[in-house]
Design a protein with these regions (language model features):
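A structural signal for small-residue-enriched, beta-sheet-centric alpha/beta enzyme cores
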Residues: 1-75, 79-92, 99-407
Length: 407
């Protein structure tokens, strides 16, 4: 597997565009269009929040009940959530606009939104935006970057990644763009992720691969513990790489799934590290668990602990907060068997052994915790299972960003 420069247009046959449709103020980019030159098989995973935004319902219908998809229209600034039948109707009108502009079936258009909940989409601006973006569609690196910028809300930077693999003597590319900074606690973040590949793979196996990698990538991210109404991961495959079609769990499927995992893991870490107001990516690994479920529960409990996140912001080795978060997670373990380490580019330091603090240097601990990526590793010595979750520190700016969000 090779990481390459690129984003959503890295794979053969995919084009993208981004621009300002007037949804946001002051001419900020707020709309993106992704298009495949040929129809794609599509897969998706979606929010588990009972309150589902209209685009989520639309996309579930397309992904689960239609054979192909060919375009994605995404706006930022308004979530189109809690908007009733009118909001769902606007998804249909968005698809109609894209269908007319691109000469593709209406039911091959996927729709996504992110932003303020409760406002109706300005459908005239969306329709005009599609017309504006259509002639700008391109397979260039610049087009991909512009599209990635257009789906941002409180993100501080666009999030893109691409990889290449060899399957059946053919080069297969997977590219992606995503957004997410606040309201990040998926259980499948607001999190939107769009992945495009030229792999030749059946719809069934594409969905299987996505469903298998999401639990250990996006579902292991938390910025603030809030699960969005709009969480969506969409994966399109157009087959233009020309590899033998993947129709079963063979070696080709394994290679593809590993690459898909790497793309989504990288994007999950991008989201966590760009949490609203964040100054550090906080990674938590649980080792020695009896089961994967136990390890996941413990890691997520630590990553969502506000007190622990605040300590990371303060570069404070307050290990008691980590042990406390593990203790109220609901997972059973013996606290007197826990070893805990802090690690970063500045070094690695054992903080507790068998549940008791060792004689460590607070100065060294502070140095380690002052890096932009910090890892806490807890070994509970009960088995062989492990899990890793990603979050960020909790800063003053998080409160300021969210207090001022609608203004």
């Amino acid at each position: 597997m090779k990481k390459i420069e690129g984003g959503i247009t890295a794979a053969k046959g995919f084009q993208a565009a981004g621009g300002a449709a007037g949804i946001k103020k002051q001419g900020v980019k707020d709309m993106a269009l992704v298009y495949s030159e040929v129809p794609c098989v599509a897969a998706g995973t979606f929010t588990t929040n009972i309150v589902k935004a209209a685009p989520v319902k639309w996309d579930q219908e397309i992904v689960y009940n239609h054979p192909t998809a060919q375009a994605i229209v995404c706006n930022s600034g308004i979530a189109n959530a809690c908007t009733g039948e009118e909001g769902y109707g606007y998804c249909r009108k968005t698809a109609e606009a894209a269908s007319a502009a691109l000469s593709i079936p209406e039911d091959s258009v996927l729709v996504a939104s992110t932003g303020v909940i409760g406002k109706q989409i300005p459908i005239d601006k969306i329709a005009a935006g599609v017309e504006m973006l259509k002639p700008q569609l391109a397979a260039t690196r610049e087009a991909a970057a512009t599209a990635a910028q257009a789906i941002m809300t409180t993100d501080t930077e666009p999030k893109e990644v691409a990889v290449q693999i060899e399957i059946g003597g053919k080069t297969v590319t997977i590219g992606s763009m995503c957004k997410g900074s606040g309201m990040i606690h998926p259980n499948m973040c607001t999190m939107l992720s769009f992945v495009a590949t030229d792999a030749n793979i059946s719809k069934e196996m594409l969905q299987k691969a996505l469903s298998e990698v999401v639990p250990d990538t996006y579902n292991m991210v938390s910025v603030d513990g809030d699960t969005s109404t709009n969480d969506t991961v969409l994966l399109l495959a157009n087959g233009l790489a020309g590899n033998p079609e993947i129709t079963e769990e063979n070696e080709d499927y394994k290679i593809f799934k590993e690459a898909l995992f790497e793309v989504n893991k990288t994007q999950a870490m991008h989201i966590a590290g760009d949490g609203e107001g964040a100054t550090a990516l906080f990674e938590v690994t649980i080792q020695g668990a009896e089961s994967k479920e136990q390890a996941v529960t413990l890691a997520k409990s630590v990553i969502t602990s506000s007190l622990t996140k605040a300590a990371i912001f303060g570069h404070d080795a307050n290990w008691g907060r980590i042990l406390c978060a593990m203790g109220y997670s609901g997972a059973k373990f013996d606290p007197e068997n826990v070893d805990l380490y802090f690690e970063s580019a500045a070094g690695k330091l054992q903080i507790i052994t068998k549940g008791v603090a060792v004689d460590y240097s607070e100065e060294e601990a502070t140095k380690i915790l002052s890096e932009p990526k910090v890892t806490a590793t807890a070994n509970i010595h009960m088995g062989e299972a492990t899990a890793t979750a990603w979050g960020c520190d909790l800063t003053y700016d998080y409160v300021k960003i969210n207090a001022d969000y609608r203004s």
